[in-house]
Each structure stands twice: as C-alpha cells, then as structure tokens.
Amino acid sequence: MWRNPARVLSSGVKVTYCDGEGREDPENILEYFNPVNSYTRSGWCLDLGKYYSLRLTDYTLRQRGSNSKNFLQNFKIQGRLNDDDEWSLLNRHYKVNWKLREWSYYGKSGDKIKPVPCKTKTWSVEGELKAHRQFQIVQLRDSMPTGAPQMSLAGIELYGVLSVPDFD
C-alpha cells in the first residue's frame, strides 16, 4: 500500500513551498493521487532527508484540470546535496506542451470515481548524473506568461539511483 513519504515522520522527507507561502498542503504533490493542485508563486522544495540522495535520471510532473492558466509553462528543476551548496541546474523548460490524460482513482469503498482530467509530462536529465538530496521546481519569472503569477502542481515523481548509507 502506498504511503506518502512526506507524511511518514521517520522517512525524513519534507516538501515545502520555497518561500513558505502557498495554497493547499505542499506535501500533496507526493500523493499517489492528489485530487487538488497545490499553488505557489515561488516553487516547491523537496528534501529527501539526511540519509538519502538520488541521482536523478527522469522525472514526471502532473497538474490537475484542463485550464492551463496556472500550469507550469516556463520553469527549472535544480538539485543540491547539502543545505550550504549552490543549486545545480538539472533542466530548464519553456512553453511546455502538456499531454492531457484522464486519471482514474478509487474511493475508500473501492468504487471507481469519475476520471479527473490532468496534464502530465516526463523528462530525462541530460549530462552527468550527480547525487542530490534536495530538489526544487522554480518558475522562471523572466518568461512567466502574462496573467499567471502563480503556478499549480498536483504530483511529482522522481526516478533514478537512490543511495542509502550503510549504517554499520
């Protein structure tokens, strides 16, 4: 059974809005299915905790709904290993062409609930794969679409090589 790692205290995983301000719970972006978008003007910061690092190879973002006004269009994803390190640019995106899909999910009683429209996209990370513990998704303000000062996100999936320390 899936459990959101940001809601399991012992995992050490944390999700926050980069500037501390936003609507909805930022941890929702790690849910298997998130029925609402989280909104922010700054971006999302994901910390895997002190025991894990990830060599990111691919990632998927999901946004709920069919209205693209607040969808991410121009943004970057960055990573770093430690709090004091500079952010490394992993990828930058402009005018993203999202794929519209229907996301089906099931209620507590096992009944299928009406499919929800969402937009998803998966990208690969090019170049040298370095280990990172913290990731952030940040809107590019210099190319922000007119009338969209905030951005929404319903889910993120990170793929790659996870490093777990040896506790011997």
Residues covered by each model-derived region:
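Solvent-exposed serine/threonine-rich low-complexity stretches and specific carbohydrate-binding patches
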Residues: 89-112
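Short, surface-exposed tryptophan/glycine-enriched loops
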Residues: 113-133
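A short beta-strand element within beta-rich, extracytoplasmic domains
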Residues: 53-66
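Short, surface-exposed beta-strand/strand-loop-strand elements in extracellular ectodomains
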Residues: 68-83
